[in-house]
Amino acid sequence: MFNGLKYVKLGLVILVYVLAFPFGYHKNIDVIDGYTNKLTVLKGDSITVYMDCKEKNRRGQFILYDILGNAIDSIITTCDTKKHSDNNAFDYKPTFCYYTGKLKSGVYAWNKSAPFIVSDVQPCDITIVFPSLNNIANNELNKNNSLQTINIQSAADNIDSYFINFLNWFKNNEKQHTVNFISDADLEDYSKFKNTKVLIFASNYLFWTKPMKQNFDKYIQSGKNALIISSTFMVNEFSFNIKQWQITLERTQERASSPINTFNSKTNKNYNSVGCSYENHISKLPIYNNNHFMTIQNNKHKIFTGLSQKKYIIIAYSGSCPPLKSIDEMGIPLYDFALLQQGILTCLAFGYRSIYEQQSIWGIYEFKQSTSSGKIINIGLADWFNNINLKKKYVSDITKNCIEYLNEN
């Protein structure tokens, strides 16, 4: 009798443990790849997840991670990847649906595959733009050196490490601002970011559609501000279609025969939107040029608050700057302001960088599309948040000062 009672108690203990600690009790399911039915989901809506798993028809645990690799939630279900007649991208059978109401705005991925964004419609101080479509397009270009029709599964891997580095920095240094996330595809819908004070771009945003560019310009012209940390920003024009669960990226006809961007063509300069382009090369530089140094030209500007030196070491390989006219005898770049039309540009700092046996200028610039528009701080350097620069306190200080400056003005 007593032995029977002991086994009953043991069974109850095991039952309580299983109910109390479901996370980790079931074996994690190994995923081959997967995708979701939306790039961006509004907080409180549900998202459908499609997964292809190594072991079929097995019950197990899927783990939800944020983009920084932290486990956020889990769900226990059976992975069944039999094809059926649904019109999603790969005809995977839906694995499960997930309600996002308890998630804060951010970038997430189930089993670290197929990232999606949870977004909020509430007014906020900062909206960070995640380069969903640009990840897809750049992954395809790196593989094939051309753009074909591709789909959402291509976005599962190879997220720009500089974007991850920026988010890690942001998490540790920015506590006082309300923050929202959107996809670059959401730039086609002005209502998704019109209520934010500052847009932040911190990655590779090479590809833009005309509506994305038009809405960005509309946002800046309304008096709102933006921080750009990118050397390839608004360079190539492309189009995309989202049909149910499939995303199609394709070249526009006007750039199908040319590797040169259309936004920087003679008739459609991106200078008028952001003041800078990656394509400004100069073949011969003064002998006193020092690569990997940044020279501050306006040390009284608020973004340099707390900095006492005029020169700082910045590792620079890929950069952008305004249209160059020449370089003076002191090695200071002179810009062709006429190409900016109504744009108002101030050079706050500049540096030289070398890549592919060419040398060119990069810098930090304050740009206004017109006298009544909002402000853009353009840090024209993809390497700003590389693993070396990230360790430098002055890189952190300048970035934080930029965010504060744009939120105050």
Residue ranges with predicted function:
Residues 49, 65-72:
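Metallocofactor- and cofactor-centric catalytic cores in central/energy metabolism, strongly enriched
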Residues 86-89, 96-98, 157-242, 385-388:
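Helical hinge/lid and interdomain linker segments adjacent to catalytic or ligand-binding clefts
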Residues 72-87:
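Solvent-exposed serine/threonine-rich low-complexity stretches and specific carbohydrate-binding patches
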Residues 15-29:
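Bacterial Sec-dependent signal peptides at the C-terminal "C-region" and cleavage site
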Residues 40-43, 48-50, 83-114:
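Ligand-binding face of N-terminal immunoglobulin V-set domains in extracellular IgSF glycoproteins
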Residues 210-308:
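A glycine-rich, often tryptophan-bearing local segment used as a flexible ligand/cofactor-contacting loop or short
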Residues 28-31, 36-46, 105-154, 173, ...:
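Extracellular ligand-binding/catalytic regions of CAZymes and related secreted enzymes
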Residues 56-67, 114-195:
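Aromatic-Pro/Gly-enriched surface loop or interdomain linker
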